[in-house]
Amino acid sequence: MKEPMVITMAREYASGGSEIAQAVADKLGIPLYNKELITLAAKKSGLTEEAIAASENQRSGSLIYSLYMMGNTMPLADQVYILQSNVIKELAAEGPCVILGRCGDYVLRERPNVLRTFVYAPLKTRIQFAKSRPDAKDMPDRLWETQLAKHDRARASYYNYYTENRWGEAKNYDCLLYTSPSPRDTERSR
């Protein structure tokens, strides 16, 4: 029996990856798993959603998590990575879906019928996109640059640590999506 098609999507912060993942899932009529992975991992583990969310994009070598987990054999970040990996594998086995982030491309690396994608955009585009969000703070572009870099460093550090690959490196993905607005897109939006 053929394995269901799964699309994994990693992305730079504010590159439009979340929106693209939702559009792909809607167009194909398949579920998108993003923050739902936190809820599902919490249900399986007995950990709180808050603890799982706080440990995302953290590596087990973090001092905060080492202190938090004193006395336990496995750091929380490692527990969460394993939990979410198991949830991702279970969801992929259940049927077609889109998995956003959480090293999905690596977790499903040995599984057939997985399209591994990475979404990226130029810094200027990402700043404009971040500023246009309803919950965006009003701050100068240089501070947005700092925020974007901080989020990307956390994602890269987490991915690089757990996968021993490099986050965003083309050889880890089947498809790279560049989300800079083209003149054609600008015309269409008028």
Where are these regions (language model features)?
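C-terminal accessory "lid"/substrate-recognition subdomains
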Residues: W144-D174, R190
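Conserved phosphate-donor/acceptor-positioning beta-strand/loop module used by diverse small-molecule
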Residues: E110-K131, L148
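ATP-dependent small-molecule kinase phosphotransfer cores
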Residues: A41-P96
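Pre-Walker A (Motif I) flank of P-loop NTPase domains
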Residues: E3-I7
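Glycine-rich phosphate-binding P-loop
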Residues: M9-Q22
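Conserved small/polar residues in nucleotide/adenosyl-binding loops
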Residues: Y178-D185
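A conserved segment at the C-terminal end of the G1
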Residues: Q22-L28
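Short beta-strand-centered segment that lines the nucleotide-binding/catalytic pocket of NTP-utilizing
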Residues: L32-A42
